Amino acid sequence: MGSQNSDDDSGSSGSSRSGSRSVTPQGGSAPGSQRSRRSGSGSDRSRSGSRSSRSRSGSGSPRSARSGSAESRHSQLSGSARSKRSRSAHSRRSGSARSRKSGTPESPQSHRSGSLQSRKSGSPQSRRSGSPQSRKSGSTHSRRSGSAHSRRSGSARSRKSGSAQSDRSESRSRSHSGSLKGNEESRSNSPNLQIDVERANSKSGSRSRSRSRSGSRTSRSRSKTGTPSPNRSRSGSASGSGSDVGVPKKKARKASGSDQEKKKSGSDSDIEESPTKAKKSRLIDTDSDSNQDVGKKAPAAADIFGDADDISDDEDEAGPAARKSPVRSKSRSQSKSHSHSRSMSHSRSRSRSRSRDKVESQVESAPKEDEPEPLPETRIDVEIPRISADLGKEQHFIKLPNFLSVVTHPFDPETYEDEIDEEETMDEEGRQRIKLKVSNTIRWREYMNNKGDMVRESNARFVRWSDGSMSLHLGNEIFDAYRQPLLGDHNHLFVRQGTGLQGQSVFRTKLTFRPHSTESFTHKKMTMSLADRSSKTSGIKILTQVGKDPTTDRPTQLREEEAKLRQAMRNQHKSLPKKKKPGAGEPLIGGGTSSYQHDEGSDDENAISLSAIKNRYKKGSGAGQAEVKASTIYSSDEDEGSDFEARRSKKVDKAKASKALRDSDSESDAGSAKSGHSNKSGGEGGSASGSENEGSQKSGGGSSKSASGSGSGSGSGSGSGSDND
């Protein structure tokens, strides 16, 4: 029983070192144990290390105690310096002394003494070192020791740096103890056991470590009862250590859940409030640990929560029932973890191989779909009789020119109709075909020879000359045939059979025909047709109705036009109203009209107006002179008298004539208006109009003095006005 108690003591201390921060598994409701739990994993580790050494020394293994103390010292270095040293020193002194005194039968006392001493020694130090610094500034000491260093020192440092020491210490403890107690102690020393089991399980890819971190209820109950299951003792994180505490500790934590506890332990109070919250926070811790473990895979759901067999209400059950079979529970948990890791690794490898096979099959099926399937060749077997004809040795391809044509049906003199010579006849290729009636058409017929055989004959034949050239004789016409090779096999001879064609041969040569000489009828006909098409004569237009040449009678037509214009002017002046002189109205009008017409005929010269002006200024002229003057001025018949009067006027009055010329130019516009006034005045009016410097009216006045021509005087006035106009 004593050995069992010491085992329980060492197991509980080891479990508290690996996971929980409290020392007493059952009576840890004191605040000192809570503080020591909060203060960090380093101090817990130092305590648990000293306790494990204590239990080992009690069982008679001094080397294991040495290794435990050495390991506790090493874990002190990885955590916060002050708190760890103080706690480890106190716990070492108190735990080792008490355990030695008490011995193995008094293992409960060693529990109590360890817890009490740890309360006394560890809690003040943890209060000093952990809580103030964590409150102030991010707590390089306490926070690292509480959350970060608990993970590093508990899991990473215990795996990496402390691996050699743990192996050595574990081997020593096992070799010295040589019993189940030694194995339990070495397993309860959580860094050593962690590395051992992790190495064994890392090959099979197990996640039992994270499961212990996640903190199932079984881990709490088993660590509480002191069962050193490797799954639970393997974890060295703060969250795992917080979870490896019994039910009484939960109550104490809820009661004294301060801010320090939240900051350091990573929401341990929330974890104990509800199992689901605890699982979530433990999952977070396991995630942070898995980040540190490079190459480790994420934990599966089965590894985190375990199977239905692992989940049990061990918290409600009593501790002694579990204490009776520590070895059985240990082996069962180990086998379960190994089997889980194997099954998970097998299932993962299977799923990976399946996914790879699927990807490969998809990649292989993709190019197969892209390749189009070749269509099967369709063949139809048809029986067609073969046509074989003796085509001779040579076959030539002939493109008939426009001066040659072929009649395919046999010639019959009874049904033969002479061709109509139409020059616009077109062949099948749209060319104008030259019709030579019989001379350029190849015909054939069948006749019976003397032997009674039907023989074919034609009006055309080929003649081969000695130099190799050929010529075509068609009736009376001779055409030279030229042979040319055909490039390619594009021209074939086919025979029509039903709706299909049957090939007979391939044309290799081509024949072209040209007239033999320029004197042949075909050549002449060709040249004539070409001449008709090429000659373009400019057409001459013939006018059937032609009139007189308008340019021949141009002078006479001009004279006629001038006469017409003069007559029109006279008609205009006739229509003007005229005032008659009393007693001499009729002769004035009659004389005026006759003299007006005469005057218009002789207006080519300016002598008429000049002489009238000169006669106006004559003084004392006789009546005979006035008659001659009037007749000479307005008559074209008496040229001599007019000349005589002009000479006399020049001699008599040269100065007055020059003055009258200047005045007539300035006052020519009022001539016609004042002619009636001069007619009224009579003989005296002549002198009055003379004073007004109007030549036409004065000459009218002079004529009115003579008893013969008062009418002519009025006419002279109007005539001079029109002349000035």
Curated annotation (Swiss-Prot):
Residues 82-101, 141-160, 206-223, 325-353, 571-582 have a biased composition (Basic residues). The keyword Chloroplast does not apply. Coiled coil: none annotated. Residues 11-70, 117-140, 224-242 have a biased composition (Low complexity). Residues 1-10, 306-318 have a biased composition (Acidic residues). Residues 710-725 have a biased composition (Gly residues). The modification Phosphoserine is found at residues 175, 186, 188, 190, 265, 267, 269, 288, 290, 312, 355, 595, 602, 631, 635-636, 642. GO terms for cellular component: Cdc73/Paf1 complex; nucleus. The keyword Glycoprotein does not apply. GO terms for molecular function: RNA polymerase II C-terminal domain phosphoserine binding. Keywords: Phosphoprotein. Residues 104-116 have a biased composition (Polar residues). Residues 354-369, 644-665 have a biased composition (Basic and acidic residues). GO terms for biological process: positive regulation of transcription elongation by RNA polymerase II; regulation of hemocyte proliferation; transcription elongation by RNA polymerase II. The modification Phosphothreonine is found at residues 286, 593, 632. Residues 1-379, 566-603, 617-725 are annotated as: Disordered. This is Another transcription unit protein. It comes from Drosophila melanogaster (Fruit fly).
